Amino acid sequence: FNSMAASLSKVETQRSEFTANVSHELKTPMTTISGFAEGILDGTIPPERERDSLEIIVSETRRLSRLVRRMLDLSRLNALTENITAQEQFDLTETVSQVLVSLEGKITGRDLDVDVKMPDEPLKVWGDPDSVTQVCYNLLDNAAKFAAKGTTITVQITKKDGKAYTSIRNLGATIPPDELSLLFDRFHKADYSRSMDREGVGLGLYIVKTILGNLKENITVTSEDGVTNFTFTLTLA
């Protein structure tokens, strides 16, 4: 009974923290949007600055949309059982290729190259295809976001001991050692990333970790001399 009570208390604490974090994250863009909109309407913002103000409103609206989308992703994760039982076989190389295509605009927009090292033939793994697609998207989006402009993102898939290892490597700022263990915490944003990523809300890597945990898989990260590498596992079919 005491164990159950402690577990329920922990869940309630996490729920309260989640609600507080959501309220804070939503309030920031809404306050900005409201402030600039009211400034335009009441004349506080002069006509010559209205366009700049509208651009800020549009930017914050998009950020709010991204935030809501992340919250929905998180809500979907919270609804998952601890073990995902409805796993199926799918081609990991095809999944990675499709995600790269969807991020092509962002990658080329930052003048990045992509070096893909994957088997030519289909590589079948076990998992939930939609969830693994989300994992690949979040990691590749993260790499594109923090890679130094004009550098190369390396995507490599290898096989060993019944597992497929997918590594995503980018060149950029080194993540401090004391931050590495916190990267996968919900709503955590490393100090080094705050100035580089004003749009993120600290959920992307948490979602990755949660999905892989539900699949009973693993993810590791290293960051040395400007090279950051994320590697996650999936079970070969």
What are the residue ranges of the model-derived segments?
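Amphipathic coiled-coil signaling helices used for dimeric signal transmission
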Residues: 1-14
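Short alpha-helical segment of the dimerization/phosphotransfer core of two-component systems
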Residues: 59-65
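Short conserved segment of the HATPase_c
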Residues: 175-189
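A conserved beta-strand-to-alpha-helix junction within the catalytic ATP-binding
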Residues: 86-104, 115
